[in-house]
């Protein structure tokens, strides 16, 4: 359960960082 959730969160955070950076 934790694995997939962390993956989704990581993808979301990565997208935000790319937009900001």
Curated annotation (Swiss-Prot):
Q: Output this protein's name.
A: Bombinin-H1/H3
Locations listed in the record: Secreted
**Keyword Transferase assigned:** no
What family is this protein classified in? Belongs to the bombinin family.
**Residues annotated with D-allo-isoleucine modification:** 2
State the protein's purpose: Has antimicrobial and hemolytic activities.
GO terms classed as biological process: defense response to bacterium; killing of cells of another organism
As stated in the Swiss-Prot or TrEMBL entry, residues carrying the post-translational modification Isoleucine amide are 20
Q: What does the record say about tissue specificity?
A: Expressed by the skin glands.
**Origin superkingdom:** Eukaryota
Q: Which GO terms describe its cellular component?
A: extracellular region
Q: Which UniProt keywords apply?
A: Amidation, Amphibian defense peptide, Antibiotic, Antimicrobial, Cytolysis, D-amino acid, Hemolysis, Secreted
User: Keyword Translocase on this protein?
Assistant: no
Principal location listed in the UniProt entry = secreted
């Amino acid at each position: 359960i934790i694995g997939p959730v962390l993956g989704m969160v990581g993808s979301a955070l990565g997208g935000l960082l790319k937009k900001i950076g």
